[in-house]
A protein has these predicted regions:
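Periplasmic OmpA/Pal-like peptidoglycan-binding modules at the C-termini of bacterial envelope proteins
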Residues: 3-6, 30, 34, 38-40, ...
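Periplasmic peptidoglycan-binding/tethering modules of Gram-negative envelope proteins
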Residues: 3-79, 153
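Short, surface-exposed beta-strand segments enriched in small/polar/acidic residues
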Residues: 44-45, 63-100, 120-132
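Short, flexible active-site loop motifs that bind/organize anionic cofactors or intermediates
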Residues: 50, 93, 110
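Generic anion/oxyanion-binding catalytic loop in active/binding sites
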Residues: 52, 92, 137
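Short, conserved glycine- and acidic-residue-centered signature motifs
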Residues: 59, 95-99, 103, 141
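Structural preference for long, well-ordered alpha-helical segments within the folded cores
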Residues: 62, 69, 105-112
Length: 153
């Protein structure tokens, strides 16, 4: 027979699912991050003489290698920063201007090798970003440079 007791309906709690669209595809972001890190590891620093912004003869092979690395890469979605740096000699204003001239010099050399200027952000740190802080000629020489940074857009 039938029992007098009615079965209580099972209460199922609905969970609200919220989908957040960040406008970015995670796989593409991860691949872009991986490529940015790889490129940054392959690009070499360009060094400069005291108070100069022209590419030295001994740095031309470095620029050639950097041009090959950048020219062979899919830079879509990436920004390439050319970071000009100086030693501590000279005023802050002078060194910021010199650092920018160094970054432009590297950009122009890469352009001459067929790497597009649209892919570059030029920045000067002047003397504010030293890799060496000793007060020696060899240390100062290390600070006269253009570094590369590759970052996702």
């Amino acid at each position: 027979g039938c029992s007098q007791k009615k079965a209580e309906p099972e209460v199922v709690k609905k969970e609200e699912v919220v989908v957040v669209d960040t406008g970015r595809d995670n796989f593409i972001d991860m691949e872009r991050d991986r490529l940015a890190k790889q490129l940054k590891g392959e690009l070499q620093t360009v060094k400069f003489d005291f108070d100069k912004f022209n590419i030295r003869k001994d740095m031309q092979p470095v620029v050639d290698t950097d041009a090959r690395v950048l020219g062979g890469a899919n830079l879509s979605g990436l920004n390439v920063k050319l970071e000009g740096n100086c030693d501590e000699w000279g005023s802050d204003e002078y060194n910021y201007a010199l650092g920018l001239k160094r970054a432009k010099s590297v950009r122009d050399a890469l352009n001459a090798k067929g790497v597009s200027a649209n892919d570059f952000i030029l920045i000067s740190y002047g003397e504010s970003n030293p890799v060496c802080t000793e007060h020696t000629k060899s240390c100062w020489a290390q600070n006269r440079r253009v570094d590369f940074d590759v970052i996702p857009q």
